[in-house]
Amino acid sequence: QRVIRKGGTYRARVRMRNGTMAWSHWSPPVEFVAGEPDLAGLRAGLVFNEIMYNPLGQAGVSAGEFEFLELKNIGESTLDLSGLFFSSGISFIFPEGSMLASGELFLLGINRAALQSRYPGLVVNGIFEGKLANEGEAITLSAGIGAPVLSVAYDDAAPWPEQADGQGFSLAADR
């Protein structure tokens, strides 16, 4: 059950805590109509750039510790990823202030130390929960109450490249 329904009219009042943790007075009521978020910029500019779903392991570190997913902003404007979340596949919520400038990458992994030992200098922006399915799956990034922003379905069978299935290679966007 949703708390707020699209098209519904609502009134809200807010208060906040200041730096000394004292509460402010309540604001005057504000009336609004709930609508869909504007996702056009995100949908046009954000892509799955690389997916390492079935990596090779190494001595003392299981293969799954090297999984990662990389997003890229291919648009011309900075994108605000704050509050976006994965509604299928892995589990991760982008924290407030997650901005992605044009051309920048945002890499999520399972184990920061393992990834940085294999790829020195790699910036790991966040740690996801769960695991990328070695047999393939759909990964969906969503906003708000679940509006899809970006989705990809990969597989470990043709026409997908076999080298990405446990042979040390990742799936990379073809642009």
Role assignments for model-derived ranges:
Residues Q1-G7:
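Recognizes extended acidic, P/S/T-rich segments that occur
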Residues G8-T9, G19-W23, P28-R175:
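Activation on beta-sandwich/Ig-like modules and their edge loops
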